[in-house]
Amino acid sequence: MGECIFCRIADGKIPAAKVYEDDSTISFLDIMPANKGHCLVVPKKHYETLLDIPDEDLKNLITVTKKVVKALSLSIGNGSYNLVMNNGKEAGQLVAHAHIHIIPRFKSDRLRIKWSHKKYTDKEMKDVQEKIKKFV
C-alpha cells in the first residue's frame, strides 16, 4: 500500500518517534496526541481493520500494546490509560490501516471519552443477543 502513511512509516520512508519495533509491529508517538505519551501500535503489514488481521498477528499486536502500556506507565504515566481502536469510517477511523491508540490518562487532563447511554427494552436485548450468538 504505497500511499498508506502507516505503511510508509513501517518501511522507514517517513520518520516517526518510534518507541518500539519488531519484525511485525511498530509503535510510535501520535503526531496529534490526545495526551502526553499518546502512542499508536501498528502492524507492519497492511490490514484495514481488526477483522482483517490474522490471529497470530493480532496476538503480537496485543502483546506489543501491553509492552508499550507498561513502558508508558513506568516512564511518564500512573498506570491509567485508554485503549482505542477505531474500525471503519463511522467509528472515526481516519487512516485505513488497523492501529491501536494508547492514551495515558492523568488526574487533571480533562480528556473525556463519553457517549450518550441508550437503553434496551427486554425484547430488544434478547433479539440483539440472539442475532450476535448466531455468528459467534
Features from the language model and the residues they span:
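HIT superfamily nucleotide-processing domains
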Residues: 1-136
